[in-house]
Amino acid sequence: MLDALGVIRIEPKAGLDSHAIAGDKIPWSYTWPHVPFGELEVRLKHYLQSEAQEPRYAEMWLRVWQELVPQDVTAYLRHQLRIHQFPDFFLVELARLLMPYDSRYSLGHWRYACWAAVRSMASISLQYPGNVEMLRSTLGSELPRRLRLTQGSLEGKLCFSPSHSLPDCALTSVFCGIATSLGDRYWMSPPSLELF
């Protein structure tokens, strides 16, 4: 998002003026030298609440939304797996499902489906302790089934909003509360250009 707004530039390789955030290892450089780095938060918030909300940025915000949803879904599934003490290797099942479904379902529907699928896994685990293949199969079948159920639900049903679920993401909070006026629509609606 900062790259799209021109605040930073992603560099092809690390250089003297580039930075890398631990964990990401992606080199970047700061491109707003007229704004001291310490004042960036206030200036960026003002920029996001004014110029960045112009219609010309709508497609960029849609791309950001489309990038945030899979990350939020993955973080939420990981969170649910850890609550039930399942290993992260079950996240592989999610990767094959995210692409075909990502434009039809809201993040709240994904969160509901992840929660329900992991609860089903927990039930199967009690009946068949240690049967990893059965758990994998349960997750692989329950996630799409639960997602399909959300399509026929009434507004707000089978949909988890951020106020009732963890983990929380600072970028998501900025995106739906400051940079755009999406608010709860971020959780309740699939990514759509018409919402900007």
Language model: regions and residue ranges:
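Basic, alpha-helical nucleic-acid-binding regions used in initiation and control of genome expression
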Residues: 1-196
